[in-house]
């Protein structure tokens, strides 16, 4: 079985759309690294997670992947604070108790914490997918609608089942 790592923000829940809108409404420039970091560290993650919608039925899609018995499934998520980590783990253990959560401090690359070689990453951020591939991993871009970009793309997580036999 291959190891399959699935990103959280922008793949499972649409937290990025909601937080980017709030950043804009607050007048915080997304290019101001310190201000953005402060915003994410002080964010009420419990509230955000409870108010944010799943993307393309992601929880059921992950359950289908687990049921296929083709992959060792992990959630691999960047975090800005301990509170963010606790809230994500708490949420995921309620809805996907069979899946292990790997939290990565935002200052580190996902490839620093997890060896990508031969493993699959599904992520909405092209930078993470590209870095994963550099580490000899299989990077797949999650998109809400097909972009026909530089990476293999999926719009529903369970599409991964038929990509690997």
Language-model region placement:
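Substrate-recognition element of Asp-dependent hydrolases with the DxDx(T/V) motif
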Residues: 49-54, 58-92
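Active-site neighborhood of HAD-like aspartate-dependent phosphohydrolases
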Residues: 1-46
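Acidic, Mg2+-coordinating phosphoryl-transfer loop and its flanking beta/alpha structural elements
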Residues: 120-155
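A structural signal for isolated positions on well-ordered beta-strands in alpha/beta enzyme cores
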Residues: 72-74, 102, 120, 140
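Conserved Lys-Pro-Asp/Glu-containing loop-to-beta segment of HAD-superfamily phosphomonoesterases
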Residues: 3, 104-132
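Structural recognition of alpha->loop->beta junctions
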Residues: 91-103, 151-165
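A short, structured active-site edge motif that brings together acidic residues
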Residues: 74-81, 89, 95-112
């Amino acid at each position: 079985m291959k190891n399959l790592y699935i990103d959280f923000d922008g793949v499972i829940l649409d937290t990025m759309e909601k937080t980017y809108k709030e950043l804009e409404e607050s007048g915080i420039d997304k290019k101001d690294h310190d201000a953005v970091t402060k915003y994410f560290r002080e964010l009420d993650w419990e509230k955000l997670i409870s108010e944010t919608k799943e993307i393309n039925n992601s929880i059921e899609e992950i359950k289908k992947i687990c049921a296929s018995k083709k992959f060792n499934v992990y959630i691999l998520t960047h975090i800005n604070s301990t509170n963010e980590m606790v809230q994500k783990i708490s949420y995921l253990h309620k809805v996907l108790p069979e899946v292990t959560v790997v939290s990565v401090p935002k200052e580190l690359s996902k490839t620093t914490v997890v060896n990508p070689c031969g493993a699959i990453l599904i992520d909405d951020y092209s930078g993470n997918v590209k870095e994963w591939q550099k580490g000899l991993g299989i990077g797949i871009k999650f998109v809400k609608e097909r972009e026909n970009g530089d990476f293999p793309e999926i719009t529903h997580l369970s599409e991964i089942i038929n990509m690997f036999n």
